[in-house]
Amino acid sequence: MAITAAASRLGTEPF
């Protein structure tokens, strides 16, 4: 998912 890709960059899950 796109969320996983974004989280990979930030190093945290933006939930």
From Swiss-Prot:
Subcellular location: Cellular thylakoid membrane
Top-level taxon of origin: Bacteria
Example GO biological process: photosynthesis
Signal peptide: none
Keyword Transcription: no
Keywords for the protein's UniProt record, in alphabetical order: Antenna complex, Membrane, Photosynthesis, Phycobilisome, Thylakoid
Membrane disposition: Peripheral membrane protein
Keyword Thylakoid part of the UniProt annotation: yes
Chief localization: membrane
GO cellular component: phycobilisome; plasma membrane-derived thylakoid membrane
Annotated function: Rod linker protein, associated with phycocyanin. Linker polypeptides determine the state of aggregation and the location of the disk-shaped phycobiliprotein units within the phycobilisome and modulate their spectroscopic properties in order to mediate a directed and optimal energy transfer.
Family: Belongs to the phycobilisome linker protein family.
UniProt name for this protein: Phycobilisome 32.1 kDa linker polypeptide, phycocyanin-associated, rod
Protein source organism: Anabaena sp. (strain L31)
Lineage start: Bacteria, Bacillati, Cyanobacteriota, Cyanophyceae, Nostocales
Gene: cpcC
